[in-house]
Amino acid sequence: MALKITLKPKERMILGGTVVVNGSSTSSDLIIEYKVPILRQKDILSEKDANSHSKRIYFAIQLMYIDEENRNTHQNIYLKLAKELVQAAPSTMGLIDKISESILSDKYYPALKLAKKLIAYEEEALSCAQ
């Protein structure tokens, strides 16, 4: 089944490891007829913006999703980061377990959604600590 995506003007997305940009001043519809990793601009985290532990976890999962060739390397980075985070904040164990289950099932997009919850949790915890 094909997937229809509407890109807003100048919006970016990653499609199978390639950055696609809508260069038009109007929205554009894309029909994707092949199963490839897709990340919309709102879901893409740059390496420089991965400036917290949970964001680095998100970034590692993002790379697992779009860079199949180096997936093992990204998984090892994720495991190290997840272990460090759980040691520093044991309350994150539940989310980390769910993220890890998704990764083990090769469900990287759902893992990214869970990692967004982890980022929100970390940000809330840090704001309460201040």
PLM regions and their residue ranges:
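Terminal leader/tail segments of proteins
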Residues: 1-130
